[in-house]
């Protein structure tokens, strides 16, 4: 059985294509069931995020299974395959294992180290488990991917530094002001960057949030979302003294805060330090504000330097993550390869059990006066003999499977014992393999 991956991501497809191929979580049951109804696709999981759509599946026919999944994606979203195929990638066997381990560990993300992708894969797996489209192999595979991601996150510093301008602003504020607990933040503007900054500041312990925006209703909505207070834009300078941290991101064509404005506010605050972050382009705050006593001004360029330095650190840590992924690939691939011998082991045990049962019944028929206790002892003895005889060939077959050398042994056993094997795995034996 082989693991295959078919998908597209921010690296191969523009957003216009990704949004057309996305799956809605509210409507995921039908495509999951359609996926595993494809010829020779026995298990399937669909991962759909803003940056990637990927299908993880198991098949005996790598080329055929891959082609059928590509056709499934095109047909389901009503896109001509010849238009879609240029954006698709596919992996199988060890390359598929490596890819999913890297994706789960956020080594393949647009922002290396971001934590969202692991949760998104867990959610996708949850749907597959709920609708029973994942089985022994993908269950084991994805749980392994989750543990690999955990190793990467705990054994490296891949997620320890800010790589967004909004989070860099919080990191910088912490360095200047120390503990942010009890600090009040004022946002000038109500766009996406201000929203991200609000999340990060409040998560870092900031006490209060003030929002000043030219369109009061929009500022009011943002303030309400985070339990803050909206300030009419024309009252900005009357309320500025309440803020310890001011982040400005408007679309104004000129500066809106001059040194004289801040000088008056600082005096009113009795020269208690104020931290200004100007991430607007063109700038919102006159750079001469930085010359004032107790006023600290940083621009988007200052933050970008932090982001770039932290990104370089993350990339360095990512190389450690890649080493962890490579270590884990070998272990999982050994387990997957060992499943190739499962049908032969199942058939061999069944043949021995058939013979044991037949011979035991013949023996018991000849001993009419045998007590129930004696019959039980004979049952245990014959079962023990059978298990001891099968122990070595079973162990050899498992080791051969882990080394990718199953054919020689399985073919010999099938011929020697006239075994009829099927592709359906024995549940108990697979459980035994999983526990190893």
From Swiss-Prot:
Residue positions binding NADP(+): 189-194
Record-marked site positions (Important for activity): 99
Keyword list, A-Z: NADP, Oxidoreductase, Porphyrin biosynthesis
Protein residues bound to substrate: 49-52, 109, 114-116, 120
EC number(s) on file: 1.2.1.70
Keyword NADP annotated: yes
Main EC class the enzyme belongs to: oxidoreductase
Pathway of action: Porphyrin-containing compound metabolism; protoporphyrin-IX biosynthesis; 5-aminolevulinate from L-glutamyl-tRNA(Glu): step 1/2
GO molecular function: glutamyl-tRNA reductase activity; NADP binding
GO annotation, biological process: protoporphyrinogen IX biosynthetic process from glutamate
Pfam families: GlutR_dimer, GlutR_N, Shikimate_DH
Stored InterPro entries: 4pyrrol_synth_GluRdtase (IPR000343), 4pyrrol_synth_GluRdtase_dimer (IPR015896), 4pyrrol_synth_GluRdtase_N (IPR015895), GluRdtase_CS (IPR018214), GluRdtase_dimer_dom_sf (IPR036453), GluRdtase_N_sf (IPR036343), NAD(P)-bd_dom_sf (IPR036291), Shikm_DH/Glu-tRNA_Rdtase (IPR006151)
Active site (catalytic residues): 50 (nucleophile)
Catalysis performed (reactions): (S)-4-amino-5-oxopentanoate + tRNA(Glu) + NADP(+) = L-glutamyl-tRNA(Glu) + NADPH + H(+)
Domain of life: Bacteria
Misc: During catalysis, the active site Cys acts as a nucleophile attacking the alpha-carbonyl group of tRNA-bound glutamate with the formation of a thioester intermediate between enzyme and glutamate, and the concomitant release of tRNA(Glu). The thioester intermediate is finally reduced by direct hydride transfer from NADPH, to form the product GSA.
Comment block on domains: Possesses an unusual extended V-shaped dimeric structure with each monomer consisting of three distinct domains arranged along a curved 'spinal' alpha-helix. The N-terminal catalytic domain specifically recognizes the glutamate moiety of the substrate. The second domain is the NADPH-binding domain, and the third C-terminal domain is responsible for dimerization.
Subunit and interaction comment: Homodimer.
Described purpose of this protein according to its UniProt entry: Catalyzes the NADPH-dependent reduction of glutamyl-tRNA(Glu) to glutamate 1-semialdehyde (GSA).
Family classification: Belongs to the glutamyl-tRNA reductase family.
Protein name as it appears in the record: Glutamyl-tRNA reductase
Originating species: Pelobacter propionicus (strain DSM 2379 / NBRC 103807 / OttBd1)
